[in-house]
Structures are given as C-alpha cells and as structure tokens.
Regions:
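Non-heme Fe(II) oxygenase catalytic core, chiefly the N-lobe of the double-stranded beta-helix
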Residues: 2-143
Length: 143
C-alpha cells in the first residue's frame, strides 16, 4: 500500500496515516468531475469520490481505515495529506475529506427515513429576537 502508517507521538491508539503527494495527484482528475454543489445535492457524487480514493490505494484504504477505527487498541486515525503544492486548494480538501468519510461509513444518513440528505445553510434575515427562530441551524433536504 502507498501509505505510511505510524503511531502518533502522544498515544499508540492514534494512528497517523501519511498520504503522499504522488497519490493525491492521481485524484485531481476524478475530483474535478464533481463540484462542491454536486456533493451537497447528489449522493452518488460522494460515493464516486470515495471510490476514486480507494482505487488509488488498490482498495486497501477503506479496509485499513475501518480496521483502525474498529480496533479497541487503536480507534483513531489522523490522515495527513502531503500538500506542498497550490493545486491542492480548499475545494480539493473538502472533496478528499468527503471521500474519506464515505470510505468509513455513511455520513448524512437519516435512519428514521432511511434516506441520504444534503445539508445547506440558511442565511439569517429576520431581525426579531424570538427564541423560536434559530437562524443558523442546518436544514436538511432529503433525496
């Protein structure tokens, strides 16, 4: 596998996973197929990112992450991408973290309705001070 996995200096339970720039560069093309907005509204886009990441690591990254997180002797993984280049912008990092989250489980899953949902923020436009209004709460759009 093209990953360096080492124990963290603070605890052996924390595993540092270092992802090399060479592997990150392989993700630029598949990540460019999806906009941040498509990640919010299209569940398949999120799964596609996860598949692209796992393919770069020959299907071993998802197994490794799940093994670390489910093992009582470890349980924590810190992923450190080797980013020395400006082509890895904040959108790339959002896509990387979204894909990594989907390798581990099913984020944005509503168990009550058994559906995935996109999350978006609502800008506060009401100037009243009613405690009933919670302007900065997330609204969920079920798909």
């Amino acid at each position: 596998m093209n990953l360096d996995i080492i124990d963290h200096s603070a605890s052996k339970r924390i595993q540092n996973i270092k992802v090399k720039e060479k592997e990150l560069e392989k993700l630029i093309f598949p990540f460019n197929k999806h906009s941040i907005q498509s990640l919010e509204y299209k569940p398949f886009s999120r799964f596609s990112l996860a598949k692209s990441i796992d393919d770069v690591f020959d299907g071993n990254l998802s197994k490794t992450l799940n093994k670390i997180l489910k093992d009582r002797n470890t349980g924590v993984a810190i992923i450190e991408p080797d980013i020395k280049n400006s082509k890895f912008d904040k959108d790339f990092l959002v896509k990387l973290s979204t894909g990594l989250a989907y390798l581990v489980g099913l984020p944005n899953f509503d168990l009550m309705t058994d559906k995935y949902y996109a999350r978006f923020y609502v800008k506060h436009s009401d100037s009243s001070d009613s405690y009933l209004r919670k302007a900065y709460r997330n609204l969920d759009l079920h798909t």
